[in-house]
């Protein structure tokens, strides 16, 4: 498996660059805005190789840091995301900001990315929130907020396990204040609200 490639950024296009590696020209899908700063310069690019949807071509995705690549790999594993959309997310939101917003459960921020709806944004947060908080040591603004986030996540998981739609669950959780309620009371309130949707 190839970890990284060192070469000259030969050309920059809207969503990929051409890397000159010993006169072998490699097409690398990437955040071209960041890579444009290194046009004509030698750069180490951390890569991820993957076959396209019809398995006819091996695509190369490139990043300036290992951390960005790791987040890309996590994003593409989320149901409904895939490689192209994962790259679109990383190209639309700054790396550090993206980690913080996912850890905070900010669905609205992710919805602003082209190609992402509320359902996909909610799924990204549901699947990656705790992982990113642990791996990147994202600090909450307060202990109280941290407990509220954890409580909302537990309520969300409980409701999803009962078969409720993720969009309806998020609608209810964002419309009420659950901070002062116990987990049991929070679930009861959410169920009451869901019955009216």
Curated annotation (Swiss-Prot):
- One of the Pfam families matching this protein, by short name: RuvA_N
Q: Does the keyword Lyase apply?
A: no
Q: Which GO BP annotation is one of this protein's?
A: DNA repair
| Principal location | cytoplasm
Q: Which residues form a coiled coil?
A: none
GO MF terms here are:
ATP binding; four-way junction DNA binding; four-way junction helicase activity
**So which domain of life are we looking at?**
Bacteria
Matching HAMAP family, A to Z?
A: DNA_HJ_migration_RuvA
Under the subunit heading, UniProt states: Homotetramer. Forms an RuvA(8)-RuvB(12)-Holliday junction (HJ) complex. HJ DNA is sandwiched between 2 RuvA tetramers; dsDNA enters through RuvA and exits via RuvB. An RuvB hexamer assembles on each DNA strand where it exits the tetramer. Each RuvB hexamer is contacted by two RuvA subunits (via domain III) on 2 adjacent RuvB subunits; this complex drives branch migration. In the full resolvosome a probable DNA-RuvA(4)-RuvB(12)-RuvC(2) complex forms which resolves the HJ.
Record's protein name:
Holliday junction branch migration complex subunit RuvA
